[in-house]
Amino acid sequence: MKAVVIDQKLTYNLLKNLRTKISNILRATSVLAFFCAILILIGCNKHDNPESNPKNSSYNYSIPEEKQDGWPVTSVEDVGVDKVLLEEAISKIVDGDFVNISSILIARDGQLIVDELFRTTLDANDAAVRNTDLNVHTMQSTTKSFASALIGIAIDKGFINSVDVSFYTLFPEYNRFENWSDSKNDITLENVLTMQHGWHYNEWDYPMESDQNTLFFIYSNYSDFVKGLLDLPMSSEPGNSFAYATMASHALGAAISGKSNKSVPDFAQEYLFGPLQFDTVYWLFSPTNRAMTGCCLFISGRDMTKFGQLYLDKGRWNGEQIISSKWIEKSVTKAVDLNFGFTDGYGYQWWMKEFTVDGQSIEAFFAAGNGGQFIYVFPSLNVVIS
């Protein structure tokens, strides 16, 4: 596990890249949603001639490498997936029909069946954490779902009482807040988890360099991002409206550290990443030395997929209950109805989507980050795709 402290200029560049407009998510999701639909068909239908090879296929399937990382591996055919259709689908990535896909991993029935890496060069995000492994990738806002998991563990372990706790009471180190109103006392931890906090917050509809962009406003005016969030004025009653807020997810990590007396990287390693046998982990830190739990985790595709499998298996991994099943269920249950195209709902830092394929309705929950970082979980198919 590695934690990297970055300077203000680099922090800004990363936050600028992080800013996630709905249109960006839709573009990335349209590709993955189409690919997910293909994979759903693979799981539900058999090719007419499974012995044939795809015409002019540029991809030949092979079983994932077996590593000492907790993942059992097997062939797609062993779990009822048509290899020919899979090769046809992945060939579209290899041939450039779908761009900017760095990797694709698929698990079915608790076994890793696809592990393919497509990217061949590192980028500026890798340079920020001095990453040299092509398999390790920025999670962007997918990090938020990990922050939710850590909150669940903190509640399971008794560090935090419940999601009903007043959010401001989690930060006793502050004795004064700007724009105070009594409604701030009514913001609960659950309100923050579901992005129904009530603060005047908008990071989607304005350019990053605009003071109307709350993410940029806090970055520009506060070295302590948590204080910047807590100082914001209210625009609605808590629990009444959805406002996506990266800084709110960042504050979740600060709450965990404050109540557990452990840094987020140490807490995550002890209670989540260690039990899941994560290999390489990088965190970026804010100017006040807090892990940036709203955006800035770096892990491998295999470990991403483990996280999805953990949620599919209701908090269990290799026989160990890492997060309570109650927390998992609550996290992926729709708390907010949305109609953004790429999603129809939001839970505890997880998105929901119902797909319709060949007249069949298939529900999914997923973690999402700008640039196409996704962990899709299809419970009815027993499938995880990342």
Q: Where are the regions a protein language model picked out?
A:
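N-terminal secretory signal peptides that target proteins for export/translocation
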Residues: 1-26
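Active-site helix/loop module of the DD-peptidase/beta-lactamase fold
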Residues: 157-199, 231-234, 260-295, 299
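Active-site SXXK
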Residues: 110, 133-163, 192, 252-256, ...
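Active-site Gly/Thr loop motif
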Residues: 278, 332-384
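A small/polar active-site loop signature that marks catalytic segments
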Residues: 202-285, 294
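Active-site-proximal alpha-helical segments within enzyme catalytic domains
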Residues: 248-255, 295-317, 373-386
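Bacterial N-terminal signal peptides
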Residues: 30-40
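N-terminal leader/targeting segments and the immediately adjacent pre-domain N-terminus
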Residues: 42-127, 155-161, 194, 223, ...
